[in-house]
Curated annotation (Swiss-Prot):
Upper taxonomic lineage: Eukaryota, Viridiplantae, Streptophyta, Embryophyta, Tracheophyta
Region of interest called NMP, as start-end residue ranges on this chain: 77-106
One of the GO biological process terms: 'de novo' pyrimidine nucleobase biosynthetic process
PANTHER family attached to this UniProt entry: NUCLEOTIDE KINASE (PTHR23359)
Signal peptide start and end residues: none
GO cellular component: cytoplasm; nucleus
Catalytic activity: CMP + ATP = CDP + ADP; dCMP + ATP = dCDP + ADP; UMP + ATP = UDP + ADP
Positions of the UniProt region annotated as LID: 169-177
Source organism per UniProt: Prunus armeniaca
Cofactors (names): Mg(2+)
The entry's keywords: ATP-binding, Cytoplasm, Kinase, Nucleotide-binding, Nucleus, Pyrimidine biosynthesis, Transferase
Protein name: UMP-CMP kinase
Description of its domains: Consists of three domains, a large central CORE domain and two small peripheral domains, NMPbind and LID, which undergo movements during catalysis. The LID domain closes over the site of phosphoryl transfer upon ATP binding. Assembling and dissambling the active center during each catalytic cycle provides an effective means to prevent ATP hydrolysis.
Binding annotation for ATP: 57-62, 170, 213
Length: 231
């Protein structure tokens, strides 16, 4: 089902954030509908992939847990995969840690390889890919490696002030949860994620969710998107 990626350790030496000449406000977000006709019919012979996008603190991880419970998806968090590799104490993980501390994006093929391995190890065929892709480079690497586009893309739209407050309050002991790094992460998100959001909006795959409110209030906006799917 999946194509193996080759060794990617050499990519770290050239890792740096890409700068776009146009800011986030330049990109028009095309509103999409959440009718049943827009949800592709999943096939157990191939993966049904949903990308879950949103800035740090937008609540996408929390909503993924609700989607998993209601619709039987497997949650694949790009951030959790990277942190798990860091916790392993491997040399690979040490370089990932340095990259995150500098507020940079981990090389695309590194994250794609970790995601691919996680999907290959699952018996499920429905996946929520949380926090990826974070850039056009990420998007292209995933689609070229996996050989397919996502079926659905969720974007949790949340004001920056609210995201900062949430990240500071959650106190998870993460290496990337200090105020300076949060600001770097938000800046990188604004510069790199909007082209991805715009791309999938124009492809008719994007569902933009207002991520302000209680967990249950936000999930009620998500639920209709996946209503045609059963566990």
């Amino acid at each position: 089902m999946w194509r193996r990626v080759t060794s990617v350790s050499h990519l770290f030496s050239h890792s740096k954030s890409t700068k776009f000449n146009q800011g986030a406000s330049t990109f028009k977000i095309w509103e999409t509908f959440t009718s049943e006709s827009e949800i592709p019919t999943p096939s157990k012979g191939s993966p049904f992939v949903t990308f879950v996008l949103g800035g740090p603190g937008s609540g996408k991880g929390t909503q993924c847990a609700k989607i998993v419970e209601a619709f039987g998806f497997t949650h694949v968090s790009a951030g959790d995969l990277l942190r798990r590799e860091i916790a392993s104490g491997s040399a690979y993980g040490s370089v990932i840690l340095s990259t995150i501390r500098e507020g940079k994006i981990v090389p695309s093929q590194v994250t794609v390889e970790l995601i691919q391995k996680e999907m290959e190890s699952s018996d499920n065929y429905k996946f929520l890919i949380d926090g990826f892709p974070r850039s056009e480079e990420n998007r292209k690497a995933f689609e070229q490696t996996i050989g397919a586009e996502p079926d659905v893309v969720l974007f949790f739209d949340c004001p920056e002030q609210e995201m900062v407050k949430r990240v500071l309050n959650r106190n998870q002991g993460r290496v990337d949860d200090n105020i300076d790094t949060i600001k770097k992460r938000l800046e990188i998100f604004d510069e790199l994620n909007w082209p991805v959001i715009n791309y999938y909006s124009q492809r008719g795959k994007l569902h933009k969710i207002n991520a302000v409110g209680t967990v249950d209030e936000i999930f009620e906006k998500v639920r209709p998107i996946f209503a045609p799917l059963s566990k």
